[in-house]
Amino acid sequence: MAKPILLKSAAELLESIVTGNIPADRQMDSYFRAHRNMGVRDRGFVAETVYGCLRERRLYEHIAGGSLPLDTVAAYLLMHGYSARALEETGFKGDARGMAERTRTLDKNTLPFAVQANLPDWLAERLPAQFGEPEALALALALNQPAPVDLRVNTVKAKREEVQSRLAEEGFPCQPTPYSPVGLRREDRVPLFQTQCFKNGLFEVQDEGSQLLSLMLEPKRQEMVVDFCAGAGGKTLHLGALMANAGTVYAFDVSVKRLERLKPRLKRSGLNNVRTVSISHERDARVQRLKGKIDRVLVDAPCSGTGTLRRNPDIKWRAIDLPELTGNQQRILAAAAGLVKPGGRLVYATCSLLREENDDIVENFLAVHPEFSPIPAGEILARRHVPLTMADAALRLYPHRHRTDSFYAMALERKQS
């Protein structure tokens, strides 16, 4: 049985996450630093409870009959084996028996779509309109499941089979990912960062779908490549490895802190073909000086992140300014396009589910940039020996179909003249 203080802790943390604007993992780290007397098992209970509540918040609020965080936590516990009596023994003052009865008689198939899918109203309206209700529900249910742990093998240092074997020797067997030719997968969370394989730079943790974005660019040795929104550099590192540590990859980002986090990863990887470039905005002089000189540009644009809800379930409960996001995406794509030389390639990608951030951005771009034309994703994937077919020119990945995070990517070629 959970200690009374743990229910209170979980409720406090849940409330701070859903009412704040700081990512759940950072808030959780901060909370545990402020409560150092909490043991490992207790921290595990609180973290698992809070993430469970974030994933299926609408369901637990339905059972609780309201949105009080402590009631939400209680409903979660009732759905995970606790009895009303056990809750009452923790000092819980809510209607434990009424909630337990609602749990016992619950028929999820009769619930409103938003509750079944555990989505906020704005997403519960958009996704059925975009995908149709059955597909939207399957997608939402998959997004509410924890993601597996995917690894990308650093092919500059080792082959996939070698890393798989060495991880097994260290007690962490993995399976090859079905699509990425350099991916490995664990279904559970284990301390992989403590392995000698990780310390030696043989792999990075990276979702399989994210690995496919770099393949869409098809960078070659000795080329000049730009990762326009590099962040902490997961795709930058992959691009550098795909180029066999030759040529140059420029990692652009507006956040110095994110680029700083890339530096130890670069050192561990053994790559020396990556250059980090801090920029103030997409029109920065450091961007302009490369205009028309770059062979390939990847734009993994800042987005709503709605495709990453398996890992970041708190995102869906925050308000987003979609017009501001899409305006920014349009400006970034236009600026990045200016870098591409004739015959070069531009890949626009997001981890968003929303058409407004994906197809609409590309369609608007092509309407004013006839010098670019789409390259079918299926052709690229076939060349890279990825066993995936796509219904149209875009790469579209979804957790209920591919067991990856949701990604969108469109490859565009600049005409020679």
Segments predicted by a language model, with ranges:
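Rossmann-like S-adenosyl-L-methionine
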Residues: 161-417
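Class I Rossmann-like S-adenosyl-L-methionine
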Residues: 1-194, 293
